[in-house]
Amino acid sequence: MTFGKALLKISRQGEHARIWEYSQAPLQWLGSPGEPPLYYLRNPNGGLLGGDRHHIAIELGAGAGLAIRTQGATRLHPGLIRQQAKVKLAPTSQLIWIPHPTIPGAGADFRQQVQIELDPSARLAYAEIWTAGRLAMGECWQFRRLSSSLRVWVAAGSPSASRQKKLWLQEHIDLRFPHQHVSTASVLGSHLCWGSLYLLGDWPEPTWPTVHVSGTESPHWLVKSPDPVCQGWILRQVGPQAEAIWQQFGQVVQQLAAAQRSSSQGW
């Protein structure tokens, strides 16, 4: 059994950022300061193994920024795997975290919890992209379980007063073998890859270009938050290639980040 940890805190004082990081194998941080700081979250094991229990915590202070990247897809190996991620974003902070796709292999039992707390003036771009299995090997829907829970709290009230957290978004997927209903038209149909891009907080309104994979339009749906406390958009996309979904999400976020920098002339 492996207990991996990856903790990262960034605070900003004027033009300078203070970064505190800690990692415990097999999780590793690899990065350097910049504008914004860019860190890779690495796992030299080539994926998550049965018995793994990983904890990821990211905290950004007021005005701080961070971009997190991965080096490739995350493969889920046979056995029970647990992972918890906690994110806390202070006013006017910005986090971009678009991981590569997650690939659940035969016999994998993956259970994930993602908890996010953000100020309405912060900006979060976060994605989850999944496949039905090791598609290149002809393996589909052979994993035991894929359970992922996402909860987002928004700080409500005046910053000078005692602020309370409002549960703003809650989503949960729980797919279990033999996955009898996943391929129905109301769920995924014939598609073997799917993903969600969450753009929460003070982003410019996004533009979603039409995506074609192998000459076929990749279906997508856009959900806009009606909540006046915190704005947000969620893009759902399905298709035959998880890498294409990941690239599309990354392009959208890059365009938004560039527009944000232009409008604010830097943080």
Swiss-Prot record:
Stated name of the protein: Urease accessory protein UreD 2
Compartments, as annotated in UniProt: Cytoplasm
GO molecular function, one term: nickel cation binding
Keywords: Chaperone, Cytoplasm, Nickel insertion
Subunit structure as annotated in this protein's UniProt entry: UreD, UreF and UreG form a complex that acts as a GTP-hydrolysis-dependent molecular chaperone, activating the urease apoprotein by helping to assemble the nickel containing metallocenter of UreC. The UreE protein probably delivers the nickel.
Gene name per UniProt: ureD2
Cellular component per GO, a single term: cytoplasm
Chief location category: cytoplasm
Function statement: Required for maturation of urease via the functional incorporation of the urease nickel metallocenter.
Organism this protein belongs to: Synechococcus sp. (strain JA-3-3Ab)
HAMAP family xrefs: UreD
Keyword flag S-adenosyl-L-methionine: no
Top-rank lineage group of the source organism: Bacteria
Family membership noted in the UniProt record: Belongs to the UreD family.
